[in-house]
Amino acid sequence: QYLAEVLHEEGYKVYGLIKGQRNPKAEMINTEFPFVELVEGDLQDLSSLIAGLEYTQPHEVYNLGAISFVALSFKQAELTANITGLGVLRLLEAIRLVGGEDNPVRFYQASSSEMFGKVRETPQTELTPLHPRSPYGSAKVFGHHTTVNYRESYGLYACSGILFNHESPRRGIEFVTRKVTNAVARIKLGLQDHVALGNLDAKRDWGFAGDYVRAMHLMLQQEEPDDFVVATGETHAVSEFVALA
């Protein structure tokens, strides 16, 4: 959503890929983001991606599609691999087949700090070894390396942003920041009296999603494609977040 708004502000014609005519998010997008034209497609179906690219003829493609909740990836590992990992390959292959010298497409892949997993150094950089510890992280590693492979093998302008946690009021309440803020609001209104959390000492690098999408856009405006870590450089404990809320 933030990315669509930034691109619209920059004067882009914005298309959004959506799976199925009856997708429950379609009405919300049409109402709140009328400048976005929805195009049907599926990261599990190469032919639909080719058709979508042929119709839209984009100059830039941003892939934020994923099964993005780490805990869910353990329960749906195959689906996570198929969408979050192989979906990147299908999209890059579609770009390779549809694009060309007459329409060079620039591609952004949303990689994740979950790829680092078992951390070997702090802070992590673009050169830190990857050691994912979840199906989600593993799928992101596949997508990340596939992006590099298509850049080096086919000369595509393809780059990855290795994003640390990016939060906003639009975040799903299954994520800890929104779980806390939602619970605090409900407690204030007398709708509940407590919130159950996991490890309060866990530390995260939390940034604002609205800032991070600007970094995504800037990455596709450079002369040469490359991969970049996108983070604040500061970590805070969950307990700090709870106290502030």
Where does each model-flagged region fall?
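His-Asp-centered acyl/peptidyl-transfer active-site segments
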Residues: E224-D226
